[in-house]
From Swiss-Prot:
This is 3-hydroxyacyl-[acyl-carrier-protein] dehydratase FabZ. PANTHER family: 3-HYDROXYACYL-[ACYL-CARRIER-PROTEIN] DEHYDRATASE. It comes from the Bacteria. GO terms for molecular function: (3R)-hydroxyacyl-[acyl-carrier-protein] dehydratase activity. Pfam families: FabA (PF07977). The gene is fabZ. One of its GO terms (biological process) is lipid A biosynthetic process. It comes from Streptococcus pyogenes serotype M49 (strain NZ131). The keyword Cell inner membrane does not apply. Involved in unsaturated fatty acids biosynthesis. Catalyzes the dehydration of short chain beta-hydroxyacyl-ACPs and long chain saturated and unsaturated beta-hydroxyacyl-ACPs. Belongs to the thioester dehydratase family. FabZ subfamily. It catalyses: a (3R)-hydroxyacyl-[ACP] = a (2E)-enoyl-[ACP] + H2O. Its EC number is 4.2.1.59. It is found in: Cytoplasm.
Length: 140
């Protein structure tokens, strides 16, 4: 488990772009984290004022940050940066709205040098909200 201070020590992101609130579990190749979605998120001012929905690209960013925490929590990667390199097979299945708790999982499926590929899922109340295959590079 990791609290927000430990997450901030791993990731360079800060408000309003830090999209991981807590890590529930982490192993060598798998992580489970949460994002508590509130009406106070700045993106709800424009997406959409009368029908607030979390933008799908920000759900994918939250998943990428979750995978980033997994990669950057490894001793050999401390102090490095993770760069988003691609997304494939992305699907959005459920709207994410204020009051939802996004449960995010990422599992490494392939690694070659500094490039890693993860399967990522975001769920709300046990139902799939979004999923995809994310590629990223770990650099200096």
């Amino acid at each position: 488990m990791m609290d927000i201070r430990e997450i901030q020590a791993a990731l360079p992101h800060r408000y309003p772009m830090l999209l991981v609130d807590r890590v529930l579990e982490v192993s060598d190749d798998h992580i489970v984290a949460i994002k508590n979605v509130t009406i106070n998120e700045p993106f709800f001012n424009g997406h959409f004022p009368h029908y607030p929905v979390m933008p799908g690209v920000l759900i994918m960013e939250a998943l990428a940050q979750t995978a980033g925490v997994l990669e950057l929590s490894k001793e050999e990667n401390k102090g490095k940066l993770v760069f988003y390199a691609g997304m494939d097979k992305v699907k959005f299945k459920k709207q994410v709205v204020p009051g939802d708790q996004l449960v995010m999982t990422a599992t490494f499926i392939k690694r070659r040098g500094t490039i890693a590929v993860v399967e990522a899922r975001a769920e709300v109340d046990g139902k799939l909200a979004a999923s995809g295959t994310l590629t990223f590079a770990c650099g200096q």
